[in-house]
Amino acid sequence: SINKITNKLDDFSKARKLRVSNLDEVGEQIVPVDLSNPDLLRTKPKNSPDARKWLDKGGSIEVDTSKIPPEWTYTDWEGNTIRYVDGFPDFKSAGFVDQEVRLKDGFDTRSKDFSRADKLAEKPKAPDAIWHHHEDGETLQEIKTRIHARFTHRGGFSLKKR
């Protein structure tokens, strides 16, 4: 809706102002998350881990305010790091994608997509892995279930037209 778009533009405008105000002496624009900053918290990727709970568990969060929208990077208590680009987790750059399968006709239902991916994959999916719907609308990525569940997110399936 128009109101949602207007609110998002306001959030990005505030994030841009934050970007300028957060420059340190060497021009760094990556800052630890500040739970007392509502403007920054509004830029949190949809369905990403709750910031306070994440920090309470011993994880860390950094926000690159030079990006529009700002990129949030979560590091868990085991040292695993995932960057959220345009609101989506980038499992591939983090080295967590074991294999990818492209569904040329795009996504259908989760069960049908998983079945198609199992048939198209070069090797069988590991028993401790899951297929992640990438935001491009046609790629499934094999990722360890533990990592996929820990780094909560809005996946590519959420963009599928219903």
Describe each model-derived feature in a short phrase:
Residues 5-130, 135-162:
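Nuclease and nuclease-like effector domains acting on nucleic acids or nucleotide cofactors
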